[in-house]
């Protein structure tokens, strides 16, 4: 039976928050090997560790800087902890229809636009890399936030392999760039079992005791020994010469694959992570959602379908034969579609400046609410998230007012992917309305 695969939380095994046992020994050893001050395994994915880490940074009534492409788990942490998010704009790649990576220049502009760093803002979050593999050097971003006295949490769920790569084959990991807290998924961008993740702590800006107290609130009291063993085994392997040899081989193959596909005319966009392939289907008049459904029926599985793109995650398995298969299926897909030009451009998100919800998200989700059609929601305050998943980046946050420009943009998003961006939204029960012109 499945129970035979697992073990109870025996003293000899312990758990992520125990002072003794095999898990505590493994965490201490790995922290030492990576030169950091703390290591905690997680069995509720990067989601649970991000929420615990954010809760260690900020408490009720305090605020944190969040990039607009923050994962929905961080918004949920704000709701659970009574934290106010202060959103920083990120570049929008209009030809691909999704956010890019925040650059040092973009961050400096956003920070300069804030009148000052109020005392209520007690920390900052960065995303490195994005789901699509975009990731500029995080060192100057982290340094800019540290200069303003802010500890930095980095969501590096999609860049775990960055921290375990030699040389300059991949972007710099935020763990090596001085971030105070870093969350790595061990199944998204590493070969661990689903739900496994790890949280790293370094420096003196965040206390280990605050992290432990937060983990105690957010993590299960009965962690699976199977998943904990996967955390240790995955990290052990990623510190071995065998991992480095495999990673370098797969990176070389990924570069060759991308070059071959581009030479064959496939509209591939550039990513900072060679293990991500971004097929810009919109250039040929095809929605990424339609392309994904068509490919899936023929056994070609992508990672992330969007209105303008289809992103593939190459992973660590051999991709022998993939280039020829993708070329063949791409030709067949184009032949199956009526000839047309590029898709109509997306409306740009009206999120170019720093902002904070008018109402604390924790209050907005608990306030009396009613459901309206999206068309009729102008001027109202949102009582829920609108968040297509994947990628899990909210388009609307509880507590934000739905102004005219935001409403027009949300309606455009609904038209582009109606199954993931609903045509209805919960709003606070009373409030002024704005009519579309």
Task: Annotate the PLM regions.
Residues 170-213, 219-230:
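Active-site PLP attachment segment
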Residues 96-161:
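Active-site phosphate-binding strand-loop segment of PLP-dependent enzymes
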Residues 3-48:
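Conserved N-terminal alpha-helix of the aminotransferase class I/II PLP-enzyme fold
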Residues 259-405, 409-418:
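Conserved C-terminal alpha-helix-loop-beta "cap" of PLP-dependent enzymes
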Residues 38-64, 76-77:
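Conserved beta-loop-alpha segment that forms the PLP phosphate-binding cup at the N-terminus of a helix
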Residues 66-85:
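Substrate-binding/gating loop at the entrance of the active-site cleft, primarily
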Residues 210-277, 306-309:
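Structural motif of enzymes handling amino- and sulfur-group chemistry
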């Amino acid at each position: 039976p499945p129970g035979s695969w697992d073990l109870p939380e025996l003293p000899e095994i312990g758990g992520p928050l125990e002072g003794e046992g095999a898990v505590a020994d493994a965490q201490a050893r790995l922290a030492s090997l990576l030169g950091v001050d703390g290591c905690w395994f997680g069995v509720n994915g990067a989601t649970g560790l991000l929420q615990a880490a954010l809760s260690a940074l900020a408490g009720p009534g305090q605020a944190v800087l969040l990039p607009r492409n923050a994962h929905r788990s961080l918004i949920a942490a704000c709701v659970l902890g009574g934290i106010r998010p202060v959103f920083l704009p990120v570049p929008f790649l209009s030809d691909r229809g999704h956010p890019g990576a925040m650059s040092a220049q973009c961050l400096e502009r956003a920070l300069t636009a804030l009148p000052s760093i109020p005392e209520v803002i007690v920390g900052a979050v960065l995303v490195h890399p994005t789901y699509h593999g975009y990731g500029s050097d995080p060192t100057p971003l982290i340094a800019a936030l540290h200069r303003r006295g802010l500890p930095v949490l980095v969501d590096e769920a999609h860049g775990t392999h960055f921290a375990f790569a030699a040389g300059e084959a991949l972007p710099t990991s935020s763990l090596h760039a001085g971030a105070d807290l870093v969350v790595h998924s061990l199944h998204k961008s590493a070969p661990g079992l689903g739900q496994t993740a790890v949280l790293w702590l370094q420096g003196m800006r965040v206390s280990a005791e605050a992290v432990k107290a937060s983990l105690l609130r957010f993590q299960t009291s009965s962690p699976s020994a199977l998943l904990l063993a996967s955390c240790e085994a995955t990290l052990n392997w990623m510190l071995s010469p065998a991992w480095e040899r495999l990673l370098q081989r797969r990176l070389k193959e990924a570069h060759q694959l991308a070059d071959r596909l581009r030479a064959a005319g496939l509209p591939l966009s550039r990513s900072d992570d060679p293990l991500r392939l971004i097929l810009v289907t919109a250039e040929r008049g095809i929605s990424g959602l339609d392309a994904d459904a068509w490919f899936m029926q023929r056994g070609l599985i992508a990672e992330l379908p969007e209105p303008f793109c289809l992103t593939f995650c190459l992973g660590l398995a051999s991709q022998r034969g993939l280039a020829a298969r993708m070329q063949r299926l791409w030709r067949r897909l184009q032949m199956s579609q009526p000839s047309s030009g590029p898709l109509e451009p997306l409306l740009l998100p009206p999120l170019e400046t720093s902002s904070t919800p008018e109402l604390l998200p924790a209050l907005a989700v608990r306030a009396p609410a009613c459901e309206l059609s999206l068309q009729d929601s102008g001027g109202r305050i949102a009582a829920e998230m609108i968040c297509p998943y994947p990628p899990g980046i909210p388009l609307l946050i509880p507590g934000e007012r739905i102004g005219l420009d935001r409403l027009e943009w949300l309606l455009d998003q609904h038209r582009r992917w109606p199954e993931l961006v609903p045509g209805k939204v919960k709003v606070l029960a009373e409030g002024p309305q704005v009519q579309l012109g």
